[in-house]
Swiss-Prot record:
Any GO CC annotation of this UniProt entry: membrane
Organism expressing this protein natively: Oryza sativa subsp. indica
Region (Calmodulin-binding): 426-447
Record PANTHER family: MLO PROTEIN HOMOLOG 1, MLO-LIKE PROTEIN 1
Molecular function GO terms recorded: calmodulin binding
Keywords: Calmodulin-binding, Membrane, Pathogenesis-related protein, Plant defense, Transmembrane, Transmembrane helix
Protein's UniProt name: MLO protein homolog 1
Length: 540
């Protein structure tokens, strides 16, 4: 008995120095992580990267959520292990095949429970009952949720890094817009045939013009030259013409980079619908269905479909340029519109990318978890080569989504009808919001002054006796012969005006009349500013 207890000592049997060392290590590691995140947040603020700071705050929120889940699993471990269900219900929808070894292990576990005088499984005391989830299985689930969150955040950071790496080439194209060669290319005095422009020739070739082959061309184009220099410059000019002045010196590359950072704070989090998707995958992971095998190709299909659709948007804009005019003046002008996107919603593209990143992280986390946990490798990886293929597909999908699809999304979705709020710098946005706030306050003052002015007008105009008494309503009344005569009631004189309007209201009205006229003029001049809308349509 003593030998059996030597490997499972409880806290009273543990040396104090061992407890202190373990606690010190845990506290120091946690404090170092918290201090590092705090310094990183300050670094983002100093460099005026508010979107990245918000993304870091969302990562902190995910870590807090993990802490709550960990706490709930620890607290609820004992109560859940005492929830008993019939063995018939416990033997259906299993993720692994219940073989002879499992049956023998279950029998041996039952014998050990009986030998331990009820010190084992709580539900083993009842005939035909088993626990809903054992303490060991809850511990394994706890580890899986932690691994899933770590992989999701890691994949999002990789996506952002590879996307920024791809966009570095676009910065060189942006700098060329200040050259004389570019100014000559977009000179409005130049006339060219539409089909001779580089943008139209690239996207409306012999195969691209055929409706049936256009989707095939768009599918393969996302792998080879998804965004070229002529594509970037044409969409840049179209965005400036639609939302800014034509000769504006606008840094389109910097705007896209800010938009990408703003979208990153969306994809880095795990929303409630994504948690439900993960729970659904766990529920469908039944032996014989091969759910984890065929569902691993779903994010790949989504990414390829999204990339093809984005390339199709560029082709449709080129087709519209050709259909609009045979001869163009200056550079070809694309017209941003939501009609190019699914259901006129460009923000749906970001949702599909977010779903893909989460699902891919789920697959990789499940693979690492089952390979590292003793006893799960044989269950979930009966065909190890098929599992290796899943890993290769997942890695390829991550590179494709990060280096091709995500930057392509950042560029093409700017061709929607609305511009994002990142069109302004952070300080400019704060100034506009403060301006709007002050204008709303002035509008409230103006409305209050107008109300008091109306009260003063009513105060100065005496009410007529006709409207003060209801006797005039009897002029059209014809008395019947059988009606008894009724005495005529003379209306009482109207009440004094001091009774009709209390003293505070009258005093306030007189105070309004004594106010200088420039104060009321300033309040009325802010009406248009207060009614202005400084909100921006966020395409996400």
């Amino acid at each position: 008995m003593a030998g059996g207890r030597s490997g499972s000592r409880e806290l009273p049997e543990t040396p104090t120095w061992a407890v202190a060392v373990v606690c010190a290590v845990l506290v120091l590691v946690s404090a170092a992580m918290e201090h590092g995140l705090h310094n990183l947040s300050h670094w983002f603020r100093r460099r005026q990267k508010k979107a990245m700071g918000d993304a870091l705050d969302k990562i902190k929120a995910e870590l807090m959520l993990l802490g709550f889940i960990s706490l709930l699993l620890t607290v609820a471990q004992a109560p859940i292990s005492k929830i008993c269900i019939p063995k018939s219900a416990a033997n259906i929808l299993l993720p692994c095949k219940a073989g002879q070894d499992a049956i023998e292990e279950e029998a041996a576990s039952g014998r050990r429970s009986l030998a331990g005088a009820g010190g084992g499984d709580y539900c083993s005391k009842f005939d035909g009952k088993v626990a809903l989830m054992s303490a060991k299985s809850m511990h394994q689930l706890h580890i899986f949720i932690f691994v899933l969150a770590v992989f999701h955040v890691t994949y999002c950071i990789i996506t952002m890094g590879l996307g920024r790496l791809k966009m570095k080439k676009w910065k060189k194209w942006e700098s060329q817009t200040n050259s004389l060669e570019y100014q000559f290319a977009i000179d409005p005095s130049r006339f060219r045939f539409t089909h001779q422009t580089s943008f139209v020739k690239r996207h409306l070739g012999s195969f691209s013009s055929t409706p049936g082959l256009r989707w095939i061309v768009a599918f393969f184009r996302q792998f080879f030259g998804s965004v070229t220099k002529v594509d970037y410059l044409t969409m840049r000019q179209g965005f400036i013409n639609a939302h800014l002045s034509q000769n504006s010196k606008f840094d389109f590359h910097k705007y896209i980079k800010r938009s990408l950072e703003d979208d990153f704070k969306v994809v880095v989090g795990i929303s409630l619908p994504l948690w439900f998707v993960g729970i659904l995958v766990l529920f469908l992971d039944i032996h014989g269905l091969g759910t984890l095998i065929w569902i691993s190709f779903v994010p790949l299909i989504i990414v390829l479909l999204v990339g093809t659709k984005l390339e199709m948007v560029i082709m449709e804009m080129a087709q519209e340029i050709q259909d609009r005019a045979t001869v163009i003046q200056g550079a070809p002008m694309v017209e941003p519109s939501n009609k190019y996107f699914w259901f006129n919603r460009p923000d749906w593209v970001l949702f599909f990318i977010h779903l893909t990143l989460f699902h891919n992280a789920f697959q990789m986390a499940h693979f690492v978890w089952t390979m590292a946990t003793p006893g799960l490798k044989k269950c979930f990886h009966e065909n190890i080569w098929l599992s290796i293929v899943e890993v290769i597909v997942g890695i390829s999908l991550q590179v494709l989504c990060s280096y091709i699809t995500f930057p392509l999304y950042a560029l093409v979705t700017q061709m929607g009808s609305n511009m994002k709020k990142t069109i302004f710098e952070e300080q400019t946005m704060k100034a506009l919001m403060n301006w709007r706030k002050k204008a709303m306050e002035k509008k409230k003052v103006r409305d209050a002054d107008a109300f008091l002015a109306q009260m003063s007008v009513d105060f100065a105009t005496p009410a007529s006796s006709r409207s003060a008494s209801p006797v005039h309503l009897l002029q059209d009344h014809r008395a019947r012969s059988d009606d008894p005569p009724s005495p005529i009631t003379v209306a009482s004189p109207p009440a004094p005006e001091e009774d009709m309007y209390p003293v505070p209201a009258a005093a306030a009205s007189r105070q309004l009349l004594d106010d200088p006229p420039d104060r009321r003029w300033m309040a009325s001049s802010s009406a248009d500013i207060a009614d202005s809308d400084f909100s921006f349509s966020a395409q996400r």
